[in-house]
Amino acid sequence: MSGPILAAGDEEELLRRSFRIAGHQTSISMERAFWDQFRAMAAADGRSMTDLIADIDAQRSAGLSRALRVYILKRLQAAAQTSPLIGDNS
C-alpha cells in the first residue's frame, strides 16, 4: 500500500453531536472519520443516524461512543471479507 495510512488532517478532529435517544438528549464524541463513515452506513441502510444509534444503544454493554466505533469497525470488516482489498492475492 502506498501513501500514509494515518495522514494528519480533519479526519482526526473530535466532533460532538447531540441526538435524542429513547427520550433523552445524548451527546456523542467521535473523530470526524468515524462520523463520516457512520453517516454513510446509515444512508446505505436507508435509515437516519438517530435510528441506527438507538438500535446500537439498546444492545451495547460499553459506552455509546465506543459501541459506535466497534459497530463501524465490524461493518467494515464484514464488507472487507465479502469484497477483498485490491491487490489481495490470497
Where does each model-flagged region fall?
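A detector of short terminal or domain-flanking linear segments
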Residues: 1-20
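Amphipathic, hydrophobic secondary-structure cores in small proteins
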Residues: 16-73, 78
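Short, solvent-exposed charged binding patches
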Residues: 73-90
